[in-house]
Amino acid sequence: MKRLGLIGLMLALVGAPAAMAQTNCTPKLGHPPLARKGMLIAAINPTVAPIQYIDDDGNIIGLDVDLGNAIAERMCLKMDFQSTQFATMIPALKEGRIDMINSFMFYTPERASQVLMVPYGASSMAIVVPKKNTDPISGPEYFSGKPFGVELGTVDLKDAQAASEALQKAGKPPIDIHTFDTYATVLQALSAGQVDGAFIGTEQAFYYRKKGQDFFRIALTGYDPHAEALAFKDPALADAVVAVMNEMHADGAFDKIFKPYGHCVLPGPYKVTTGPIPTPDCPPQTQ
Protein backbone atom coordinates (compact mmCIF):
# COMPACT_ATOMS: atom_id res chain seq x y z
CA MET A 1 0.00 0.00 0.00
CA LYS A 2 1.34 3.41 -0.94
CA ARG A 3 0.78 6.69 0.83
CA LEU A 4 1.13 10.23 -0.47
CA GLY A 5 1.71 13.15 1.86
CA LEU A 6 -0.67 16.01 2.35
CA ILE A 7 -0.98 18.31 -0.63
CA GLY A 8 -3.42 20.91 -1.83
CA LEU A 9 -5.96 22.54 0.39
CA MET A 10 -5.80 20.54 3.62
CA LEU A 11 -5.12 22.73 6.63
CA ALA A 12 -4.25 20.68 9.68
CA LEU A 13 -5.07 21.88 13.17
CA VAL A 14 -6.18 25.37 12.19
CA GLY A 15 -9.10 26.79 14.13
CA ALA A 16 -12.20 28.23 12.55
CA PRO A 17 -13.79 31.35 14.02
CA ALA A 18 -16.01 30.41 16.93
CA ALA A 19 -19.75 30.85 16.60
CA MET A 20 -21.01 33.07 19.40
CA ALA A 21 -23.19 31.68 22.16
CA GLN A 22 -26.38 33.38 23.27
CA THR A 23 -25.61 36.05 25.84
CA ASN A 24 -28.83 35.68 27.82
CA CYS A 25 -28.59 32.03 28.82
CA THR A 26 -26.43 29.88 31.07
CA PRO A 27 -24.09 27.25 29.57
CA LYS A 28 -25.42 23.74 30.11
CA LEU A 29 -21.95 22.42 30.96
CA GLY A 30 -18.70 23.83 32.33
CA HIS A 31 -15.04 22.85 32.50
CA PRO A 32 -14.81 19.90 32.98
CA PRO A 33 -16.25 18.06 31.08
CA LEU A 34 -15.63 20.71 28.41
CA ALA A 35 -12.01 21.16 27.38
CA ARG A 36 -12.43 24.93 27.78
CA LYS A 37 -15.03 26.83 29.78
CA GLY A 38 -17.87 28.23 27.71
CA MET A 39 -16.72 26.62 24.48
CA LEU A 40 -17.59 23.50 22.49
CA ILE A 41 -14.51 22.40 20.53
CA ALA A 42 -15.11 20.09 17.58
CA ALA A 43 -12.69 18.41 15.19
CA ILE A 44 -13.64 18.82 11.55
CA ASN A 45 -11.93 17.94 8.27
CA PRO A 46 -13.04 20.80 5.98
CA THR A 47 -12.32 19.09 2.69
CA VAL A 48 -15.65 17.30 2.20
CA ALA A 49 -17.80 19.77 0.28
CA PRO A 50 -20.66 20.47 0.64
CA ILE A 51 -20.77 18.87 4.08
CA GLN A 52 -17.73 20.72 5.43
CA TYR A 53 -15.30 22.85 3.45
CA ILE A 54 -13.45 26.16 3.28
CA ASP A 55 -15.08 28.95 1.28
CA ASP A 56 -13.34 31.66 -0.74
CA ASP A 57 -13.06 33.84 2.36
CA GLY A 58 -11.29 31.13 4.36
CA ASN A 59 -14.28 30.23 6.52
CA ILE A 60 -15.27 26.65 7.31
CA ILE A 61 -18.86 26.17 6.15
CA GLY A 62 -21.29 23.36 5.30
CA LEU A 63 -23.90 21.08 6.81
CA ASP A 64 -21.75 19.89 9.72
CA VAL A 65 -20.88 23.49 10.58
CA ASP A 66 -24.56 24.46 10.56
CA LEU A 67 -25.36 21.48 12.78
CA GLY A 68 -22.53 22.16 15.24
CA ASN A 69 -23.39 25.85 15.51
CA ALA A 70 -27.05 25.05 16.19
CA ILE A 71 -26.14 22.55 18.91
CA ALA A 72 -23.70 24.96 20.58
CA GLU A 73 -26.21 27.81 20.48
CA ARG A 74 -28.83 25.74 22.29
CA MET A 75 -26.23 24.77 24.88
CA CYS A 76 -25.28 28.45 25.36
CA LEU A 77 -21.71 27.74 24.27
CA LYS A 78 -19.34 29.19 21.71
CA MET A 79 -18.61 26.79 18.85
CA ASP A 80 -14.95 26.33 17.90
CA PHE A 81 -14.15 24.11 14.91
CA GLN A 82 -10.60 22.78 14.78
CA SER A 83 -9.48 21.72 11.29
CA THR A 84 -7.98 18.27 11.84
CA GLN A 85 -6.76 15.42 9.67
CA PHE A 86 -9.35 12.68 9.80
CA ALA A 87 -7.01 9.92 10.97
CA THR A 88 -5.96 11.96 14.05
CA MET A 89 -9.45 12.81 15.30
CA ILE A 90 -10.14 9.87 17.62
CA PRO A 91 -6.71 10.16 19.28
CA ALA A 92 -7.32 13.90 19.81
CA LEU A 93 -10.71 13.13 21.36
CA LYS A 94 -9.28 10.48 23.66
CA GLU A 95 -6.56 12.90 24.79
CA GLY A 96 -9.13 15.54 25.70
CA ARG A 97 -7.88 18.16 23.23
CA ILE A 98 -11.33 18.41 21.66
CA ASP A 99 -14.85 17.88 22.98
CA MET A 100 -16.38 16.11 20.02
CA ILE A 101 -15.89 14.96 16.45
CA ASN A 102 -18.32 16.58 14.01
CA SER A 103 -16.80 15.57 10.70
CA PHE A 104 -18.88 13.31 8.46
CA MET A 105 -17.63 10.31 10.45
CA PHE A 106 -19.28 7.02 9.57
CA TYR A 107 -20.54 4.92 12.46
CA THR A 108 -18.83 1.56 12.89
CA PRO A 109 -18.93 -0.84 15.86
CA GLU A 110 -15.14 -0.60 16.03
CA ARG A 111 -15.22 3.17 16.42
CA ALA A 112 -18.11 2.89 18.88
CA SER A 113 -15.94 0.63 21.04
CA GLN A 114 -13.36 3.43 21.33
CA VAL A 115 -15.53 6.55 21.74
CA LEU A 116 -19.18 7.44 22.37
CA MET A 117 -20.98 7.68 19.04
CA VAL A 118 -24.38 9.20 18.28
CA PRO A 119 -25.71 8.34 14.78
CA TYR A 120 -27.86 11.06 13.20
CA GLY A 121 -27.59 10.96 9.38
CA ALA A 122 -26.50 8.69 6.58
CA SER A 123 -24.50 8.67 3.38
CA SER A 124 -22.65 6.29 1.08
CA MET A 125 -19.62 6.03 -1.17
CA ALA A 126 -19.16 6.64 -4.87
CA ILE A 127 -16.52 5.24 -7.20
CA VAL A 128 -15.08 7.79 -9.60
CA VAL A 129 -12.87 7.10 -12.62
CA PRO A 130 -11.32 9.17 -15.42
CA LYS A 131 -13.95 10.36 -17.88
CA LYS A 132 -12.46 8.28 -20.68
CA ASN A 133 -13.18 5.06 -18.74
CA THR A 134 -16.67 3.99 -19.79
CA ASP A 135 -16.53 0.45 -18.38
CA PRO A 136 -19.43 -0.71 -16.19
CA ILE A 137 -18.17 -0.86 -12.59
CA SER A 138 -20.04 -2.65 -9.81
CA GLY A 139 -17.50 -2.32 -7.01
CA PRO A 140 -13.85 -1.89 -6.06
CA GLU A 141 -13.10 -5.42 -7.31
CA TYR A 142 -12.87 -3.89 -10.79
CA PHE A 143 -9.51 -2.43 -9.73
CA SER A 144 -7.76 -5.77 -9.30
CA GLY A 145 -4.09 -5.04 -10.02
CA LYS A 146 -4.81 -1.34 -10.57
CA PRO A 147 -4.03 1.77 -8.49
CA PHE A 148 -7.04 2.94 -6.47
CA GLY A 149 -7.27 6.01 -4.22
CA VAL A 150 -8.93 6.34 -0.81
CA GLU A 151 -8.79 8.73 2.14
CA LEU A 152 -6.70 7.57 5.08
CA GLY A 153 -8.53 6.43 8.22
CA THR A 154 -11.93 6.04 6.54
CA VAL A 155 -14.51 3.30 6.04
CA ASP A 156 -13.78 3.43 2.32
CA LEU A 157 -10.19 2.40 3.03
CA LYS A 158 -11.47 -0.65 4.89
CA ASP A 159 -13.90 -1.43 2.06
CA ALA A 160 -11.05 -1.29 -0.45
CA GLN A 161 -8.86 -3.48 1.76
CA ALA A 162 -11.64 -6.05 2.19
CA ALA A 163 -12.21 -6.19 -1.57
CA SER A 164 -8.48 -6.54 -2.16
CA GLU A 165 -8.21 -9.42 0.30
CA ALA A 166 -11.17 -11.18 -1.35
CA LEU A 167 -9.47 -10.85 -4.73
CA GLN A 168 -6.27 -12.38 -3.37
CA LYS A 169 -8.18 -15.30 -1.87
CA ALA A 170 -9.73 -15.87 -5.30
CA GLY A 171 -6.27 -16.00 -6.83
CA LYS A 172 -6.51 -12.58 -8.46
CA PRO A 173 -4.16 -9.58 -8.13
CA PRO A 174 -4.94 -7.34 -5.15
CA ILE A 175 -5.99 -3.73 -5.49
CA ASP A 176 -3.03 -1.34 -5.47
CA ILE A 177 -4.40 0.93 -2.73
CA HIS A 178 -3.04 4.47 -2.44
CA THR A 179 -4.02 6.49 0.65
CA PHE A 180 -4.35 10.25 0.85
CA ASP A 181 -5.11 12.78 3.58
CA THR A 182 -8.29 14.24 2.05
CA TYR A 183 -10.88 13.67 -0.67
CA ALA A 184 -9.42 16.71 -2.42
CA THR A 185 -6.03 15.05 -2.73
CA VAL A 186 -7.68 11.81 -3.82
CA LEU A 187 -9.26 13.69 -6.72
CA GLN A 188 -5.98 15.45 -7.49
CA ALA A 189 -4.31 12.06 -7.80
CA LEU A 190 -7.10 10.84 -10.09
CA SER A 191 -6.74 13.94 -12.25
CA ALA A 192 -2.96 13.47 -12.45
CA GLY A 193 -3.29 9.83 -13.48
CA GLN A 194 -1.71 8.49 -10.29
CA VAL A 195 -4.73 6.25 -9.67
CA ASP A 196 -7.23 4.62 -12.04
CA GLY A 197 -10.19 5.13 -9.73
CA ALA A 198 -11.15 6.23 -6.24
CA PHE A 199 -13.69 6.15 -3.45
CA ILE A 200 -15.16 9.49 -2.41
CA GLY A 201 -18.47 10.35 -0.76
CA THR A 202 -21.47 10.22 -3.08
CA GLU A 203 -22.45 13.78 -2.18
CA GLN A 204 -18.91 14.99 -2.76
CA ALA A 205 -18.80 13.36 -6.19
CA PHE A 206 -21.95 15.17 -7.33
CA TYR A 207 -20.81 18.43 -5.73
CA TYR A 208 -17.45 18.49 -7.51
CA ARG A 209 -19.08 17.59 -10.81
CA LYS A 210 -21.55 20.48 -10.43
CA LYS A 211 -18.59 22.76 -9.77
CA GLY A 212 -17.21 21.96 -13.20
CA GLN A 213 -14.61 19.33 -12.38
CA ASP A 214 -15.39 17.24 -15.44
CA PHE A 215 -12.24 15.15 -15.60
CA PHE A 216 -13.96 12.25 -13.81
CA ARG A 217 -17.04 10.10 -14.28
CA ILE A 218 -19.21 8.89 -11.41
CA ALA A 219 -19.16 5.16 -12.14
CA LEU A 220 -21.07 3.94 -9.07
CA THR A 221 -23.08 5.55 -6.27
CA GLY A 222 -24.71 4.29 -3.08
CA TYR A 223 -21.88 1.88 -2.22
CA ASP A 224 -21.86 0.63 1.39
CA PRO A 225 -24.27 3.12 3.04
CA HIS A 226 -23.37 4.00 6.61
CA ALA A 227 -24.82 6.12 9.37
CA GLU A 228 -22.90 9.27 10.23
CA ALA A 229 -22.30 10.06 13.86
CA LEU A 230 -21.02 12.63 16.29
CA ALA A 231 -18.36 11.26 18.65
CA PHE A 232 -17.54 12.09 22.26
CA LYS A 233 -15.31 10.95 25.11
CA ASP A 234 -17.27 12.29 28.08
CA PRO A 235 -20.67 10.69 28.88
CA ALA A 236 -22.12 13.87 30.43
CA LEU A 237 -21.32 15.88 27.31
CA ALA A 238 -22.67 13.15 25.04
CA ASP A 239 -25.92 13.03 27.01
CA ALA A 240 -26.29 16.82 26.93
CA VAL A 241 -25.78 16.95 23.16
CA VAL A 242 -28.17 14.02 22.63
CA ALA A 243 -30.87 15.90 24.57
CA VAL A 244 -30.37 18.94 22.33
CA MET A 245 -30.41 16.82 19.16
CA ASN A 246 -33.70 15.18 20.13
CA GLU A 247 -35.15 18.60 20.94
CA MET A 248 -34.04 19.88 17.51
CA HIS A 249 -35.53 16.86 15.78
CA ALA A 250 -38.85 17.32 17.59
CA ASP A 251 -39.20 21.03 16.81
CA GLY A 252 -38.17 20.75 13.16
CA ALA A 253 -34.76 22.39 13.44
CA PHE A 254 -33.03 19.27 12.12
CA ASP A 255 -35.08 19.30 8.93
CA LYS A 256 -34.32 23.00 8.39
CA ILE A 257 -30.58 22.28 8.63
CA PHE A 258 -30.49 19.13 6.51
CA LYS A 259 -33.09 19.89 3.82
CA PRO A 260 -31.04 22.48 1.87
CA TYR A 261 -28.29 19.88 1.47
CA GLY A 262 -30.62 17.06 0.43
CA HIS A 263 -29.02 14.99 3.16
CA CYS A 264 -30.56 11.90 4.75
CA VAL A 265 -31.61 12.28 8.39
CA LEU A 266 -32.10 9.25 10.63
CA PRO A 267 -35.53 9.15 12.29
CA GLY A 268 -34.40 9.25 15.93
CA PRO A 269 -34.64 9.30 18.84
CA TYR A 270 -30.89 9.82 18.98
CA LYS A 271 -28.71 8.11 21.56
CA VAL A 272 -25.22 6.86 22.28
CA THR A 273 -25.00 3.61 20.33
CA THR A 274 -22.77 0.54 20.38
CA GLY A 275 -22.53 -2.61 18.32
CA PRO A 276 -23.97 -3.28 14.86
CA ILE A 277 -26.85 -1.13 13.63
CA PRO A 278 -29.22 -1.59 10.66
CA THR A 279 -28.15 -0.30 7.27
CA PRO A 280 -29.64 3.20 6.89
CA ASP A 281 -32.74 3.27 4.69
CA CYS A 282 -32.11 6.35 2.58
CA PRO A 283 -33.02 7.00 -1.05
CA PRO A 284 -30.04 6.84 -3.42
CA GLN A 285 -28.63 10.21 -4.41
CA THR A 286 -28.72 10.91 -8.13
CA GLN A 287 -27.51 14.50 -8.40
Give names to the regions the model predicted:
Residues 23, 66-74, 133-134, 141-142, ...:
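Extended ligand-binding regions for polar small-molecule ligands
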Residues 69, 73, 78-142, 278, ...:
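Acidic, polar ligand-binding/catalytic clefts
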Residues 122-129, 209-246, 264-287:
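Periplasmic-binding protein-like
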Residues 87-91, 104-113, 159-163, 191-224:
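A ligand-binding cleft/hinge motif common to bilobed small-molecule-binding domains
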Residues 23-104, 251, 260:
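Extracytoplasmic small-molecule ligand-binding "clamshell" domains
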Residues 65, 80-91, 135-136, 176-188, ...:
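Short helix-initiation/N-cap motifs at beta->coil->alpha
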Residues 22-25, 30, 155-172, 248-287:
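Ligand-binding clefts/hinges and TM-proximal coupling segments of bilobed small-molecule sensing domains
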